[in-house]
């Protein structure tokens, strides 16, 4: 039995100015004023009542927000201490949309959505947009360039021109486009046709006789290393987990794993790019939150920050809405526009289709921004229509810092490009540039090199350049005054590229596989370059003034170098850099005491270092469990042991025990802030023994604010049993009192 009692306290409660605004999705109401005892139910409701410098404290739960923060300086939004708060950008197709899936004749299931969606999740794992050649997220094959089809153009054959691409008939893991039988017209081609740049274009024509597709010309075009894949057409659905959304009819098509009924699955669709848009507000902070399939954008802010936050699937392209050739200024990514002194710290960004973070604006509009002690993984599996040189972390401004971070598994050709005079220190980066040709891990164009400081990084296991001072060849290169020191690079294709002049590269260690390029490339081309640079105290197996030729043919300029250990000059069949380090296989890169490296003072570490520096994040990243919503009560019929947030929809089986009756009386004591409960059980006999529970709920019927348990043991000859309890609530009501009774399982 249940009975409610009400209180008007929360409707009339006032929040003193300067105190936090509390939010509780389970027990709050946006009709209340946001005190600790009378919280709001949404963050948006709290923001509507907020003033500058307010703090919004959010209790555990799942929140679907779409809010603009305008002219609220100093606002902080954070999770309550110890609570898990997830900002969710998806809607459940079954629960939120109440939509029903149907089966098409070819076995593909479909559902009509009430609003647009462009990213599909099964059990909170992203499903693959239908594509050819096939690839998947589960095995990371989306980051394998062999899962792209190839074009036939080379520097010498002039096979086709911009706006056309001839398929090579099949290579790698798949056959050719003609063999597939697919009609590509109307699909979207993701085209890597400009080395470090890729574009999405609608396929407008298909000539099967010469296996050539046509599309609108791309902005940049190179005559080598062409690769592509197709998306955006129902015909491409051929493996389990693939989907396509028809934006004209709002119909979603999906090939369900193992021929299951999609109506029985936890399927969610992304419906918003941003949960929070911050405009005209300085010092806005988001702290200790999780974002799932949504993110944040800032415009015109100073001192805004994201701290102690995990973002999963924050960035997406618009191709899921069948939009190709996206404007790079309007990509749906975590972005700061015209912002300075911003901070991202102790945060994680995972699984994006697009860049991880973008800062837009020139030197006067975007400067002194910092990304520190943060983790980036599985960033950008399509690498199309992104800004700059198409990078993982982008900033177009000046004096920005990227420090103590960890990055691995990225698609874009360049990883870090953060504007003029960058500081890139204490990072560990590997497995980068997987889906484009050319590129570098730390990329500095000619005008960005002045006062750059690149130091104390580990960069390894990549086919891209490690640290590159880029620009035109020869005397036209005016890149100047970058400093690169105390870095360790291994298994890198051209670890350090020094191009320009007046640069300083010292105390770097480079070892192992050079992947066809010199470890340190100090370019002198067309009679110009690096006449005044200083290259000192480095340890590398190959240092020369050419990308791949040796020291004898391309020595460094006289007077620019000294105290280096250069394998071209000093090495032998038995001696290389790694042979003189303490334990490089276990990442101890200190030189062995009394080794030649030690005597020269060459390399990134000193032999006497007792606490050698280690780059990367200072904490251990553990991916959160999926933010599953369900019944949390283990006594309920629909208890979900995997759920972490309450759905408020537990189901209980009603058991009638003969002529058993009960009466519940719950009254507010007029002279005190407590409630008295009297429960009478009638027709109880001594032949049966029962257990009971009395509990109170406020908003969420699954959340027990207080409970009592006991046994009913009537005396022989009696058939009534009475329970009296008293409780003082910690929060104002209204409350509902519940009583459950069941047979003693031990009897």
Regions found by a protein language model. Name each.
Residues 1-9, 623-655:
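Primarily marks secretory-pathway-exposed extracellular/lumenal segments that are disulfide-
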Residues 66-67, 293-298, 315-324, 330-332, ...:
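Short glycine/acidic-rich loop motifs that flank beta-strands on beta-rich extracellular proteins
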Residues 52, 277-285, 302-305, 330-345, ...:
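Surface-exposed loop/turn motifs in large extracellular/passenger domains
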Residues 64-76, 475-588:
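Predominantly extracellular beta-rich ligand-binding scaffolds that present long acidic/polar faces
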Residues 653-677:
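Short, compositionally biased P/S/T/A/G/V-rich stretches that sit at domain boundaries
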Residues 289, 309, 342, 347, ...:
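Consensus "Asn ladder" position of solenoid repeat domains
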Residues 723-731:
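Short, hydrophobic beta-strand segments
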Residues 10-331, 335, 586-593, 598-624:
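Extracellular polysaccharide-degrading/modifying enzymes targeting complex plant/algal/animal polysaccharides
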């Amino acid at each position: 039995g249940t009975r409610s009692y009400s209180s008007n306290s929360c409707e009339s409660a006032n929040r003193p100015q300067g105190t936090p605004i509390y939010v509780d999705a389970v027990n709050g109401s946006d009709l209340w004023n946001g005190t600790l005892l009378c919280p709001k139910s949404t963050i948006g409701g709290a923001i509507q009542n907020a003033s500058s410098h307010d703090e919004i404290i959010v209790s555990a739960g799942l929140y679907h927000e779409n809010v603009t923060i305008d002219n609220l300086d100093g606002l902080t939004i954070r999770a309550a201490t110890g609570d898990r708060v997830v900002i969710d950008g998806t809607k459940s197709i079954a629960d939120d949309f109440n939509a029903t899936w149907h089966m098409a004749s070819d076995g593909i299931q479909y559902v009509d959505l009430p609003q647009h969606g462009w990213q599909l999740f099964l059990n909170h794992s992203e499903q693959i947009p239908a594509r050819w050649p096939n690839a998947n997220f589960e095995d990371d094959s989306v980051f394998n360039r062999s899962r792209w089809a190839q074009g036939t153009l080379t520097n010498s054959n002039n096979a086709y021109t911009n706006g056309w691409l001839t398929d090579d008939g099949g290579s790698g893991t798949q056959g050719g486009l003609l063999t597939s039988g697919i009609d590509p017209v109307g699909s979207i081609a993701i085209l890597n046709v400009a080395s470090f740049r890729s574009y999405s274009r609608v396929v407008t024509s298909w000539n099967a006789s010469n296996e050539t597709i046509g599309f609108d010309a791309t902005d940049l075009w190179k005559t080598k290393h062409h690769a592509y894949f197709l998306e955006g057409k129902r015909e491409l659905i051929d493996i389990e987990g693939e989907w396509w959304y028809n934006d004209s009819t709002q119909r979603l098509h999906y090939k369900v794993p193992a021929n299951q009924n999609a109506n029985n699955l936890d399927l969610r669709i992304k419906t918003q790019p941003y949960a929070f848009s911050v405009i005209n507000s300085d010092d806005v902070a988001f702290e200790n939150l999780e974002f799932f399939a949504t993110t944040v954008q800032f415009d015109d802010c100073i001192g805004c920050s994201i701290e102690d936050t995990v973002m999963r699937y924050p960035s997406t392209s618009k191709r899921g809405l069948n939009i190709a050739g996206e404007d790079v200024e309007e990509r749906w990514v975590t972005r700061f526009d015209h912002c300075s002194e911003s901070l991202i710290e102790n945060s994680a960004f995972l699984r994006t289709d697009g860049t991880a973070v973008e800062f837009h604006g020139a030197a006067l509009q975007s400067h002194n921004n910092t990304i520190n002690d943060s983790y980036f993984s599985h960033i950008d599996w399509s690498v199309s229509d992104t800004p700059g040189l198409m990078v993982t972390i982008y900033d177009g401004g000046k004096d920005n810092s990227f420090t103590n971070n960890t990055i691995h598994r990225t698609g874009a050709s360049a990883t870090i490009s953060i504007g003029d005079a960058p500081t890139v220190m204490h990072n560990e980066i590997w497995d980068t540039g997987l889906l484009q040709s050319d590129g570098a891990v730390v990329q500095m164009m000619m005008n960005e090199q002045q006062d750059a400081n690149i130091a104390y990084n580990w960069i390894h296991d990549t086919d891209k350049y490690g640290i590159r001072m880029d620009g035109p060849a020869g005397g036209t290169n005016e890149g100047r005054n970058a400093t690169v020191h105390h870095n360790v690079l291994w298994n890198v294709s051209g670890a350090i590229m020094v191009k320009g002049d007046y640069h300083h590269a010292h105390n770097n260690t480079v070892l192992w596989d050079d992947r066809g390029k010199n470890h340190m490339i100090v370019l002198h081309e067309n009679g110009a370059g690096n006449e005044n640079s200083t290259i000192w105290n480095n340890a590398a197996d190959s240092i020369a003034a050419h990308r791949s030729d040796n020291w004898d043919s391309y020595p460094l300029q006289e007077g620019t170098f000294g105290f280096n250990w250069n394998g071209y000059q000093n090495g032998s069949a038995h001696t290389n850099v790694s042979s003189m380090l303490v334990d490089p296989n276990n990442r101890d890169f200190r030189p062995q005491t009394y080794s030649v490296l030690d005597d020269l003072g060459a390399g990134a570490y000193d032999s006497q270092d007792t606490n050698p520096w280690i780059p990367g994040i200072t904490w251990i990243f553990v991916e959160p469990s999926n933010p599953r919503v369900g019944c949390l009560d283990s006594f309920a019929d629909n208890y979900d042991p995997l759920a972490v947030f309450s759905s408020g929809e537990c189901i209980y089986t009603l058991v009638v025990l003969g002529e058993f009756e009960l009466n519940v009386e719950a009254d507010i004591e007029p002279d005190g802030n407590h409630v008295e409960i009297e429960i009478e059980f009638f027709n109880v006999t001594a032949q049966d023994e029962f257990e009971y529970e009395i509990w109170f709920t406020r908003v969420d019927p699954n959340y027990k604010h207080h409970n009592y348990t006991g046994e009913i043991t009537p005396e022989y000859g009696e058939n009534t049993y009475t329970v009296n309890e008293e409780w003082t609530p910690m929060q104002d009501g209204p409350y509902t009192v519940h009583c459950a009774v069941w047979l003693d399982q031990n009897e």
